[in-house]
Amino acid sequence: MNKLLLKDWYVICRKEEIEENKILLKYVFDQEIIIWKKKERIMVWENLCIHRGSRLSLGSIKKGILKCAYHGWEYNQDAQCVKIPSQPDIKIPKKACVKSYKVIEKMNMVWINLSKDTNDFVNIKEFNESNFNHVASGPYIMNASAPRAIENFLDVAHFPFVHENHLGVKDKPMIDDYDVVSSNKGIHASNVKVFQPNPDGTNKSGEVIYDYHVHSPFVASLGKDVSKNERFVLVFYVTPISETESMIYTLTLMNFGKLDDKIVRDYQDFITAQDVPIVESQRPELLPMDLQEELSIRSDKISIAYRRYLKKMNISFGVS
């Protein structure tokens, strides 16, 4: 495992997934994580009772206290044990606590960080512009490595075939040459042209010019200017469950139109469902770093740049 990856922020859930007095279980980098809330406060902990290692996800919540199902140990919202039923009169040591994680709440999503030393949060420019509506979608579970999922997101040549009559049409599959710039901060591809009959659920067809960004190993985005003052952005977040399984969330940002949140989510659900069986079928499961293992062509420029970016950062997770 690359320590560098653990320093990044990962989407653990949408806020709507967390219900009062219920424990939500997730998996991140093969670690079991629980999420629960009391009113507006969200707690994200390791799924492990400090006493005898039982899963706290089997426990219960009442009045802002999480109770372990095994011996009834009770933990407050600061992850500190406040009651040991078998010895109610003892002074509870400070080490009787659950490991908790840093949390960022933004755009109706919850991010966590598994490291004490964190990288900067990926802050998309449109996040801070008040005229943009935002809709979070997911989770989408994909039995594929995180790099495979990201590379598919960056690939436009599959649009006419996997997303026919939505993101592309089979009689217009050509991808013109486009520009790619790589740096230590990521990748930027511009002037990516593709004909699309219904690219964002608005049923407006025509040639679309995209720009793509890789912000960190497992965060990428695409954007397009619909008109001079109208812009569409889709951010793609991959949270690794394991080296060969991923949890995906997307964030749609638009400063035009008045689409219902459900319509946006339904469209994203539909598009992602088309991608899943394709990406899950790819072999090898781990993304090859040796570019000679597969045959690449000009339209693969951004995926080649992505593989070189991972290699330059010495990423070994999800790759071969």
PLM region spans:
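C-terminal catalytic domain of Rieske-type non-heme iron oxygenases
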Residues: T118-S320
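Rieske [2Fe-2S] iron-sulfur-binding domain
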Residues: L4, V11-E129, H134
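Basic/polar N-terminal segments that are highly enriched at the extreme N-terminus
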Residues: M1-L4, G318-S320
